[in-house]
Amino acid sequence: GWIEGFNQCEAAMTARQRRRLTAIFLLLAYVHTEDEFMPVVTMLSGHPNFLADVKAVPPGMTFLFPDHAQAPLWADMWEKCVELNTRFNTRPAVKTSDALGGRWTENLGTYVWAFLRPSLRTDFLLKQYDGRERFLSPQLADVADWLVNALSAPFDGESPAGYQNLLAVDYGREWGVLAPGKGPSRVHPPQGAHSEQRIPPRSLWYLGQCLRRYAPLAAEHAMWAARPKNQDMEAGANSKEPWDLMYQGPENRGTNPHLRSRKFTGYGIVLRSAVDTRDELSIHLQQIDEGPNYRWGRAGEGGCGVLYFYAAGKAYSYTGPEDVGDRDDQDTDFCTTFGVYKNGEFRSIGMNVLSRPTYDLGPGQFTEIVPRTGPSSYATPEYLSRSVLLAGHDYFVLYDSVAHQAITHRLTWFVRKGDELPSIQLLRGAAGNRESQRTELTTPSVAGQWFDGIGDSLAVVSHRKDIKAEGTAFGCRVSLPGSEDIVFRNPQPVTFAEGDLIFQGTAGLIRKTGAKIEFALFHGTRIGIAGLVFTTDDQDLGLGGAIVAGQAPSGEFFAPQASAVRITLPNLFSKAVFFVDGAAQPAHREAETLVVQLEQGSHRWELSDTLPVPIAPRIVRTENFAGGGAVIIEPVASATRYRLELSKDGGSTWATVDEQPSPTLKAGGLTESEKVHLRVIALNAVHASPPGPEYPLYVSSQPPAPPDGLRVALATGAATVGWGEILGATEYLLYARSGNDAPFQLVYRGKERSFVHKKEGIQACDAIPGRRTRATDASMIEYYVTTLDGNGESVRSHPADTDPASWRNWDPKPGERFRRVNSFEAGSPPESSEWARYYPE
């Protein structure tokens, strides 16, 4: 590249060469700074990876020519570009649909990395300029979490046949692909244009480095997910380049997040089971929504409805680099999906918001996506929904519901050419008549099958070869060695009674395994096992659990909204108390029935006439001191003591280091500069909880580092000052002064990471930044923040101020959140936009 080329060759240049090249480079900086090329002031131009490329030019000149008068302005301008680019291109969390934020506008397969790679390189250059970390925003922490949670179950590597075929037909796309025998490693599914199933590039690790003094847990998880020696985006295997300097430093393997099933706004759902074991599997169900999107694929309105399945170290579905990318093919041609025959073509489910709940109830999991309705409908009214019901870590039931049973459909499944398909047992929608046909297809990249049928489709899919399934009117029966399952899945409610097993609803599971009975009610009004019956009027209340001889019945529930359940108790449990998260719940008792009000959200329940099992406690923070740290945890109900465990090998083995009745524990006597992990177990007289999430502790006797990301949001008479988080901090101290010669005064001290400083004379930001000289009068306030822990106070952070002309303080739309539409007229009614302008809070 030209930055590293100039940097490397400058010493050998003649004076004339240096003058001419310097003039050319500075001209490039001037051209790329203003709004004539990829504007930022009058509009936020895109796509975001283009903006990252273009706006990287001026800060590159800051690195090459640090004494240039415009060098500070170019650095500040780039920082603001990062802030705006991430603010308006990162899908937010949507609490009403229990969806997390972080999905980037551009596709996972290629273009999120096309944004990150040049941005991270620019950030590296600017850190050489003045040491300030600029690649920061709350949204970047969310992006890191999304990139981590989008990873598959551990993958052992491509099959020899599949890998040889890849090298032969898709040369140039193989960067990041895991060669045979090189696993296990987690990979991203091949989603969008130019995609492959790849290990995350080293950019993710470096993003973690950027976030360490801002969003440290997101940083830890990113460094766990990617390694500094991973192949970079589009880099050749074992290639050497100047940017390798970015990835040198002490070994740090981050912190294991112990991935769980997750839903992400505008992306889809990832279901997981048996995480961190050899039985781990993951199912990735994709559905993007209307709004800023780039290169997610032409087929299926961006791959909507496509499914990816990883289990037992293998990939059991695959999409070629452009098959749901830039190729002009139809929705169901070369991917794992489902389509209804509509207007002369098979249509997948199409774009829509993720409005249906996702359930992770232990024995079973369930998720569902639906098509959009209205004038812009794509698959309605013919297509109703696509759902996945996951039973343990053994198999899943894929159900596609259509409007009536005469609609022609196509279920498709594809793997990499040379790989094997999973076990697919079609139990509904494939009756053997003329509409039921199977077509085998092979392209240079993929091999797969079309299953054409009519009406609803129910398929039992598994990586296991010893699975047997039988279709029924209520769904299916599934047999595995050692277990018998009854799966309830039907668009219309079914009523089932067999011995002491009861079910009423549309989606559920009952599993018998020896002396254990597990159950899950996803959508319905009633489920009963062994005389224990749960009844509800809320058909979206999800409730699962297990009955094991000699143990109290227990499980999980998820209530999208506050709800109620009626529990019929056999004599054995007639004196039992209903506990939620270890706390006894008020209940109305009627004979052998308890009526309990359930709070919104995901919770653990237990029916017990003794003490319940406490839930796993979470470490809130640590407070460092020489040789260790205090560990502050969130107290949990029913716990009388807490046990602190420590690991020195990244969580492989654990040893007890403290046990106390209070939710503050200590780990001491540790070696200087070592990194350890901590976790806590809650105890009472009868039970111990599962271990809580692990938390990193960096042992030091030195004062801490200051936080990164000190920024100011201006308004008339007030400045909202915010900063990042430091692991091990006891509290933060914010200092301010007015005028360059005045002493700094402490204006805030505490654990919060933002403070509203109200003072007369503070001005709102200018409408256009950088158009007047820096304010120097006494009304301008300068800030810095420090960190305090048991070892003392840190040095000062990089400063911030209230200069209304500064690029760093400029905000074109104060307070505006992620916008789903590109533009709208001021004052126009919301319904004038093509779709909702904003997600609900």
Model-derived features: positions:
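Pro/Thr/Ser/Gly-rich low-complexity, intrinsically disordered linker/stalk tracts
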Residues: 612-637, 672, 687-728, 777, ...
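Conserved Ser/Thr-centered positions that define the repeating blades of beta-propeller domains
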Residues: 647, 736-737
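Beta-strand-rich modules
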Residues: 667-687, 757, 761-794
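Extended polysaccharide-engagement surfaces of secreted carbohydrate-active enzymes
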Residues: 107, 114-580
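Short beta-strand elements bearing conserved aromatic residues within extracellular beta-rich modules
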Residues: 576, 642-644, 732-734
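Short beta-strand segments within Ig-like beta-sandwich modules, predominantly Fibronectin type-III
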Residues: 586-588, 656-661, 746-751
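Aromatic-lined, polymer-binding surfaces characteristic
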Residues: 1-151, 823
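C-terminal beta-strand-rich structural cap/linker in extracellular carbohydrate-active enzymes
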Residues: 449-460, 591-612
